[in-house]
Amino acid sequence: MSIKSDKWIRRMAENEGMIDPFEPGQVRYNADEQRLISYGTSSYGYDVRCADEFKIFTNVHSAIVDPKNFSDDSFVDVKSDVCIIPPNSFALARTVEYFRIPRSVLTVCLGKSTYARCGIIVNVTPLEPEWEGHVTLEFSNTTPLPAKIYANEGVAQMLFFESDEVCETSYGDRGGKYQGQRGVTLPRT
């Protein structure tokens, strides 16, 4: 299994629709020449953007977090260019980009160091072979202060690994519960 390069990522995005919308280079400034947290193609990965749809966790109902019986009541929906995450809390968001993962590829997501150095951790599970959809992102604010996430800027990097052998059963074959997800998707059992 080997990690894939910028050339491969560009080819797969442009010819196979693996990433949509796709940025072939690294974007570091907006149209007004203001600095951004970078996104787009890097040497051995793709830096994704966070869309402007957020679900911010709140415990106004004194609920218990149960992945088998998760309630949307635990979140406040926000549509904004920024998301303020309360201290020691978290928020869900989604990528701007829609992914279509090839059958021979496993994709792993890592948080960007810009956020990690501020105590904001990005968590995403692997994107399995033949999975497609918007990626649901989880941002944990590990600090005792409110933390800010910027929409339409880089938040995490996707690394693509291609196997020497194609899997026998893909996520698509199994009819995975998150197949084709759009928007911020809560846990399903």
Curated annotation (Swiss-Prot):
EC code: 3.5.4.13
GO biological process: dUMP biosynthetic process; dUTP biosynthetic process; nucleobase-containing small molecule interconversion
Keywords carried by this UniProt record: Hydrolase, Nucleotide metabolism, Nucleotide-binding
Alphabetized InterPro entries for the sequence: dCTP_deaminase, dUTPase-like_sf, dUTPase_trimeric
Signal peptide per UniProt: none
Pathway: Pyrimidine metabolism; dUMP biosynthesis; dUMP from dCTP (dUTP route): step 1/2
Superkingdom classification of source: Bacteria
The keyword Hydrolase belongs to this UniProt entry's keyword annotation: yes
Top-rank EC class of the record's enzyme: hydrolase
Catalytic activity entry: dCTP + H2O + H(+) = dUTP + NH4(+)
Gene3D superfamilies: 2.70.40.10
Catalytic residue list: 138 (proton donor/acceptor)
Binding partners and assembly: Homotrimer.
Family (UniProt): Belongs to the dCTP deaminase family.
Function of the protein: Catalyzes the deamination of dCTP to dUTP.
Official protein name in the record: dCTP deaminase
Gene: dcd
